Every structure is written in structure tokens, then in C-alpha cells.
Amino acid sequence: MVDVNRFKSMQITLASPTKVRSWSYGEVKKPETINYRTLKPEREGLFDEVIFGPTKDWECACGKYKRIRYKGIVCDRCGVEVTRAKVRRERMGHIELKAPVSHIWYFKGIPSRMGLTLDMSPRALEEVIYFAAYVVIDPKETPLEPKSLLTEREYREKLQEYGHGSFVAKMGAEAIQDLLKQVDLEAEIAELKEELKTATGQKRFKAVRRLDVLDAFYKSGNKPEWMVLNILPVLPPDLRPMVQLDGGRFAASDLNDLYRRVINRNNRLARLLELGAPGIIVQNEKRMLQEAVDALIDNGRRGRPITGPGSRPLKSLSHMLKGKQGRFRQNLLGKRVDFSGRSVIAVGPTLKMYQCGVPRLMAIELFKPFVMREIVAREYAGNVKAAKRMVERGDERIWDILEDVIKEHPVLLNRAPTLHRLGIQAFEPVLIDGKALRLHPLVCEAYNADFDGDQMAIHVPLSEEAQAEARLLLLAAEHILNPKDGKPVVTPSQDMVLGNYYLTMEDEGREGEGMIFKDIDEAVMAYHNGYVHLHSRVGIAVDSMPDKPWKENQLHKILVTTVGKILFNSIIPSEIPYLQETTNENLTDSTPDKYFLEPGQDIQTVIDSLEINAPFKKKHLGNIIAEIFKRLRTTETSAFLDRLKDLGYYYSTLAGLTVGIADIPVIDNKQEIIDAAHHRVEEINKAFRRGLMTEDDRYVAVTTTWREAKDALEKRLIETQDPKNPIVMMMDSGARGNISNFSQLAGMRGLMAAPNGRIMELPILSNFREGLSVLEMFFSTHGARKGMTDTALKTADSGYLTRRLVDVAQDVIIREDDCGTDRGLVIRAITDGKEVTETLEERLFGRYTKKSVKHPETGEVIVGPDTLITEDMAAAIVNAGVEEVTIRSVFTCKTRHGVCRHCYGINLATGDAVEVGEAVGTIAAQSIGEPGTQLTMRTFHTGGVASNTDITQGLPRIQEIFEARNPKGEAVITEVKGTVIEIEEDAATRTKKVFVQGKTGMGEYVVPFTARMKVEVGDEVHRGEALTEGSIQPKRLLEVRDTLSVETYLLAEVQKVYRSQGVEIGDKHVEVMVRQMLRKVRVMDPGDTDLLPGTLMDISDFTDANKDIVISGGVPATSRPVLLGITKASLETNSFLSAASFQETTRVLTDAAIRGKKDHLIGLKENVIIGKIIPAGTGMARYRNIEPLAVNEVEVIENIAVDEAIVESSED
């Protein structure tokens, strides 16, 4: 058996007839499949056991030889070799075709490879192949042109004219094969290269395309005539099975029908040739054979597809590979796995962060082999069969064994759709009753799970290695941070937030206010016995909490706080200051001094002088988690999270918050506000009727009036709300709902959008407490429906975007420590107009500097060169007033097929520097794709007359950027660096002209009349700067500026879209994706290299090709950078396996076969396809080639190290 993990590379070429014969175990001569009576395969048929091997293991067809001991013997009666039945999946047969047949992939693909090789048009080829015309193969002495076409009539006339045998002309694939055999590749290539030196325009384009194909044949060693088949391979029978159904009927693969047609026509052709039938009949039969083979290879590519019962097109060999149901995506990239189950999930509030509840019945089934092994080991049963019976009977003793087996054996839980890597995490199983899986409430956010009927799948890692990885890398307690932005992803929500909010509230004049306690226990006892309320402000001796980081001047004093806050602080690690207020200073520095009592001071006076502090909201809890993680890392954080969860649930239960209709307040002056708005609208309409304003102005004024009315009601609501109102508490704490929900309950619902997206002028005046009228209800349904459809469409769009992103970046892996590049990227804050979309501080954190950063005033070095910037350093840089910093960036990294550690920086998911082997491309793709569903689908109209273009935003804009399409609402850019000297308006053509004066000359740009200008007369502009509002076309920018400018522009654009929707994504993820779009260059002039002009190639391959030429003193090739959209970039990847499994499978494989492409299995996808361990993480060569050391060797190495250290110190 071939060991997949030893594979170096995989090559695909055209198969020569000898190759096909060498694969084959015999010729299939009859169209029969199996005998209808005996159900045994027919001899020489499509399922023949002589050719393809036995149907039963170690048993010949007639039954003379049975058992493994006859292995390898060929039966003398039936001729079947005694071997495993599995060989029926690998042994091929063949069909000897009685006439050559063209391969439809090479004749029909775009561009037609046959056509380019012969320099004939695809239409001419079609006429010849399908017997509609003759082609002149050898004109001999006649004046006929070689390769010219003759109709049947012309052919006969020419024969009469020049005499029989005076020239050779044929029809059918046979003629094409003869022509292909005549092609002299070397001579043709030399001729084309000469032609290229002078050719221009269309002629040059065609020559380049022909040269490309001929060169591919020449370099790969494929012969052009192999594009025509004389012998057809037959797929192994178990890959096109025939199975008996219950009713005695048979279900067979479509391929069998297609093969049957080929065999029937081939046999008929053989008979006709034997009988010497008239030419026209033979011709017709040959054409039918050609069509049968076409249908077998790619049914439906030419003409109407061959259909089966119910006029359903039959699935041909090509269809077996294509699409989501094809071989690649269905069976190779995603397989169904054993040792897995799925069930509904329920909440497990008592679980620890690293645990999940698994139903007993499920666990016994999943861990069956482990339990059976243990039963035999404990001698409850003599052998495995007996042990299996024990488990299936449900013997009492198996449950104790199960408990022992699952200890320390993590399982993986996955929820579909798995949008990012947090969609699969490992947990330790805890056995529970019932049939639902129990999930820890804090991991719900990562899975995007809720308990309204969601289901999850469970998988068991089997090998020791898999268990170790699950435990060390995938355990849920390790995944505190989100890989997309490095912020905690496990923040408490809903009840947990509410409980902690309630617990940390403060209130005036509640029972027990001003009491002083000696320690925590006394305070808690007083609370339990009803002497003091949770929210009462009381005093407690600082010295009773010795492990907190108090300042010197705070010791031996009394702290003013509440019992709730004492309880809340008791779960917080002792390294964090006592949290008395929600400020950042309190969290990072120390508890403010104003809460401490000097000896002899009256506590009541201090309490009265203090403001009432806001309770801890969801945002503050998130900050606390982040701070604890920063200081104490994973283990302590996950333990703290569990304590926070328990506390939250406990106190939200105790608080007993309920919502009734009386809790929705009534706004006293609602009617006045609405009447005023009505009055204003009436005035606007009057003004419109008098002709004082346009229809557009009136519409804008009316909608604005109603918006203002709604805002006024909302403002009034906020002013009058009672902080103890349960709805307000839920909203304020961030547990559920927001001000907009609240104002719909108590204010007014406001304006609604009509089905066409335009906002209707009639607002909904009622709120949900009062109830809506029938008409209002009807209006509001439009929006609801649109919301649902948008979400459904968006999910599909976003999923497809993620798939394309993953595909283009899947081979980007951290390959080395430092690439040693001499380039860096200058970064500053990203701004959109006046507002900052991403601050410099956010952009600096977790990157390596390229040059040292100096203080702009004092000149002192804040951060040295090639240093990892921490949060504190980033803050120091920004505080010093530095506006731009040169950092190491993915854009400028020199590593081939990946990135180096220094150019990438910190791994956002762990907060530490990234490790070699991290699959950063996939992480980047997931980080950009996962929030895709949160982006909007709409194209905004910029209101009325301001501009005539719509600005695309949300998901469509992201797709536009990554596919490098020409944007809607394109901005005009300048190609000259200089000053804007005049902007003249031309009313006649309805355009403006902008004149830019530069050092090298004057630039004149025509701008639409309605476009909004971004520049004024006298402004300085740089090359590639936008003169008008709108999006710059990146391909145009690439022509005017360099690659780095385009990369920086695309990065800023992507960030603008995501940030405007409140989604944060680390720069480095976008950098990884954008770099993949600019990996290729197009060769302009090959110089002395053997590159072809017009070829697309990887930058690193281009540099390599030039390196040798430059060293030997030749003329290097020149090239131009190319910007590819992600779909195009995925298809242009060097790995044909990866490209074929993405899209356009047949096109990719046709091209790869002609070029004889080798796939070096560098990316992740190609390794998954062939089943090899992926070259990322622990699958990287440097982690796999580790030799275990014997104990004594370790000692020797340690001694050597000690000796070396002694030597070094003595040299000093």
C-alpha cells in the first residue's frame, strides 16, 4: 500500500495509448453487465471478474478456489485471480476503439487546445470531427492549401479535377490525428517567437496564446496526437456500482449506460467495417461513436445531453468531479467520519469552562471500543466478541468502566455553520442523564449557539496524538480571545450580566447603610440575616483583605463599599485592585482614595459626599476579563469566568426581575410632541403647494420632522426612566435589548421602509404598549419581511465569500522566523474624511517595528528596531505625539508561500508572538468571512440630489474590493503630482474640468457635473489621489502608483466597511488576503530568459528566473504587477489540485494535463485531498522529524551544555 505521507508531489499528464494499455487488465468487448438470472457478472462485460477481479474476497467466480490460502492463484476453470474484492475499485479495463475519437475537453474547452495547436478555428474542427467536411492533410502537387476544408461536393469535384490519389483529405477525428502528428513543435515555437518580435494587437495576442499551448506540449513531453483517443480506459466497476434494490430492481451508475452506448456503437462499427459497408453508413457510425465518447467524458458539453429515464441528463465522468456533489468537494475535502454523533443542545450552567455534558447512551456508543478493551482487560469477558455482547446487553458493570474510560479523554463539539475556528472546540465529557448534549453557557458566543433547538455534533479524537492536540490546543478554556481582533470572545451575557449588574448596584438609604464590618464573613452574615441590603453602602476594614494590592496610604483604613461589591470582588483574582467603580484607573491602577475613611471620620458624612456609582455593565465585565487575561493568562481567566458565571446566575435568580405591562412607562407629553410634528408637516406641505420647495426637498423635510419627533420621545424616555425599572436594568446592563427596542415599546415606532427601500412618509405613531392600528401593522410587515429575506440572502453570500477567501489564502502559513526583508510599511491612523476609522494605537499593537521609533520632540528612542510592540508601548508611542511608524508588514514579507514570524507579529488568538506553522491564511479568511453576515446588503442612496452615484457599502462593497471589480461610483484620480490650478465648469456638456499643474506637465481631468469635488483650487495632490468623492478603481491605481499603494488603499477600504458596521478586524488578516491578490506579475519582455511574453507568474518564480540570467550577465525579463480578484487568484494558484477543487474543474484539469503540471503539495487543501497530514501546525516537517532521545542521551546533552557555559564564562 502506498504511504500517502511519503508523497513528495503529484503530476497530471495526458495518457498515451501505451499508458492506457499498461493500466488495463483486459478488454471490455460486450455491453452486458450482469446476468439477470444468476446475478453474476457476464464474461467480457462491464463487470467481468476476469478483468476486474473477484466480487467476493479470496473466491474465484466458479467457486473452485475459496479461502485466503489460494491467494494469487488464477483459477484454471473460470480464469479469475483469487484476491481481495477491493481490487475491483482499482483495476481498470479498456475498449479498443475501431476509429479514433477526439477528446472533448481538448477540442471544446476555451480556448480550444486542439484549435491552437493546429491553428484552426474551433468551428472548422467541429465540422471535420463530426463528419461535415473534409480537411486537406497533404495537398501533394495540387494547389490546395493544407488544413483547408472541403465540403463533400467540393471534395468530389477536386478528385475529378486532379485525379484520385493526387492529394490526401480525410474527415473525422482520424484526420485531426494525422494533422496533429505532423505538428513540428520546435519549428512552430521558433517561428512564433520570431513573429512576436514584430506582431502587435490581435495578431500578437493570438501568437502568445498559441505559443503558450505549443510550449506546454514541448516542455511537458506530451504528444499533441494524444488529444485524440484510439483506446478508451474503463473505470473500475466498484466506482460505477450496480446495486440491487429491495424490489429486485437494479440501481446503476449512469456511467454504465454511457459505457454501454460506446461499446454498442464500437461493436456495430467493427461489424460494418468487416462487411465493407458503404462509406456513408460507416461515417455515420463513426460520428455516433464520437458522440457516445463525448457524452461519456463530458455529457452536455456539445449539443443536447444524453438523457436517462425521466429526461434527466446522465452524469458523465466530468460531472463526477464537478461542483459541491462532485468527487473533490463531497468525498475528498469533506468526509463523513466514524465515532461521531449529534444531538440537541441544552444549557449546562453547573459545568466548568472545559466540560460538556454527554448523554450516557451517546457516550457508550461513541466509546464502545475503548470500553470493550477495558472489559477484556478486567477479565469480565474472555474475548472481544463477548465484551461486545456485554455492552449491547447493557450490563450493569459497563457504566463504571465508561466513567474510567472517558476520564482525561477530550471530545470535540462542532456547531454548523462553522464560520471560524472557534466553531470546533474540545471539552472533557461529563456523563449525564437525558438525551441532550449540555453546553457551557459562556462558549455559546463563540459557537453562535442558543438553546432554542440548535443541534451540535460530537467527535471523538482516537489516537494519542489527536487527544494530546485536543487537550493542549483545542480545549475550550484556552479559547478566551477571538482570533479576528484579539478581544475576549467569552464575555458573559444575558442572566450572567444581569446578576452581576444587580449585585454591584448602589442605593441611598437602604437598610444597614453606614454599618462597619471587621471582615467579609461578618458583612455576608449581616446580609444573610437581613441587617443590611446588598446595595447599602457600608464600611469594611481594609486589613481584612490582605491579598489585594492596596497602596501604602490605604492600609489600616476603612473602605466604603457595598455588600454586593464585597461579594463581587471576592471572586476576582487578588492581583487586580478592589473594584469599587467602573473606571479604567480603578481596574488597572488602584482603588481611588476617596472611598477610604481616615480614622475618626464619620462614615455617614463620607457616604453622603460620594456620588452613587454606576453598576458593572457588560462592557465593564469585558474589560475586567481582558485585564485579567493580560496579567494572568488562560488558566486563571477561565477559572474566573466560571466564578463570574455562577455569581451572575445566582444573583439574577435572587433579584427576581420580572417584566409586566406596568413596567413600560407612559410618556406624559407624547401627544404634544406628535401634534407639533403634525403641525410642522402641514406647514411643509403648504410651502410645497406654493412652490417654495421641490418634491425632493419636501420629502426630506417631512421624514426629518418625524425622525426628530421620534428622537424627542426617545430623549424624554431616557430623562424620565427609573434606574430600578427591570426593563431599564436589562437594557442598561447590556443583558438584552437596546434603547431602540425600549422606545418602540414606550415611545413611537417611527418611520418604516416601503418594499422598494424608500422610507414612507407616514410614520407609525403608536408604540407596542398602546398597540398598533391595522394600517400601522400592515406598514410594519414590509420591513419584517425584508429583514428575513435579506438575512437569508446575506448568509449565502457571506458563506460563498468565506469560501473564496479561504481558497485564495489556504497556503499562507508561517514558514520561517525572519525573512530578513529590508522594506517596511509606514502606517498612520486610517481616516474617512474627518473621522478616524482605526487609530494608530490599534494598528501598532502586536506588530514588529522596522526602524526605531523616536520621540518627536526629545529624540529619545521609545521602541527599538525589530521589537514586538506591546499595548503599553503602543500607548507610549501615541502619547508621545508620533503620527506615523514604520513597521514590519505582511505586504513587504519576502517568505515564499507564506509569511515569516516578524512580518506577521502577534497571534491575536493567544496574545503571544505567532508560532512557525500557524495557518495564518485560513485564520485571516475566517476572520474576514465570519462577520460577513453582520454586514448589510444594501446600497445606500446618498439622499436626494447630492450625488448621482450610489455608494456601495456592506457586503457588496467587500466583494467588490476582494474581486478587484470596477467600483460603482468611481472616483477620478490624478496621474500627475502637483497643484490644482483651476476647475472649470462646462454647462453645455454638463462636465467639470480639473487642471493639475505638475513638474513634468499638465494633467486635465473631465469630471461629471454632479460629482462632489474632493479638492479645491490651490490644493497639492499626489499621483493616484482622488479628485472627486467615491471609490478609486484599484487596477487604475496600480497603473499610476506602485503595488504597496494599492495594498494600503485596499486595506483601508476594507477596514472602513467593517468599522462602519462596528466590526473590528485585525489589520494583519486583511493584509494576508490583499497580498494574495498581488502575488502575480505579467511578463512584458522575456529578455534572455525562456519565459513567454504575457505569462502570469508568481513574483518569486519570476525573480528566480531572472536571478541566473543576471548572474551570467544576460538581459533580465521585465514584468508588470497584476491585481487579481480572489476567485481569479485561487484559480491561478500553482497547485492544480487546489484550483480544480475550487471552481471550473474541467478547465483547470485540461490545462494542467497539457502542461504536465506537478503539484508540490505546499498548501493545506491539496494535502487534505490526497489524505496527507497538512503542512501546518504539528504537521510541519520541522515538528514531525523529531527523534525521541534515550534518558542517558538527555543527560549527556545537558552536561555538554553545562560544559559549554563554563567555557564561555571562563573566556569572558
Swiss-Prot record:
One of its GO terms (biological process) is DNA-templated transcription. Zn(2+) 2 binds at C819, C893, C900, C903. One of its GO terms (molecular function) is DNA-directed RNA polymerase activity. InterPro entries: DNA-dir_RpoC_beta_prime (IPR045867), DNA-dir_RpoC_beta_prime_bact (IPR012754), RNA_pol_asu (IPR000722), RNA_pol_N (IPR006592), RNA_pol_Rpb1_1 (IPR007080), RNA_pol_Rpb1_3 (IPR007066), RNA_pol_Rpb1_3_sf (IPR042102), RNA_pol_Rpb1_4 (IPR007083). It catalyses: RNA(n) + a ribonucleoside 5'-triphosphate = RNA(n+1) + diphosphate. Keywords: DNA-directed RNA polymerase, Magnesium, Metal-binding, Nucleotidyltransferase, Transcription, Transferase, Zinc. Binds 1 Mg(2+) ion per subunit. Binds 2 Zn(2+) ions per subunit. Zn(2+) 1 binds at C60, C62, C75, C78. SMART domains: RPOLA_N (SM00663). DNA-dependent RNA polymerase catalyzes the transcription of DNA into RNA using the four ribonucleoside triphosphates as substrates. HAMAP family: RNApol_bact_RpoC. Belongs to the RNA polymerase beta' chain family. This is DNA-directed RNA polymerase subunit beta'. It comes from Streptococcus thermophilus (strain ATCC BAA-491 / LMD-9). The gene is rpoC.
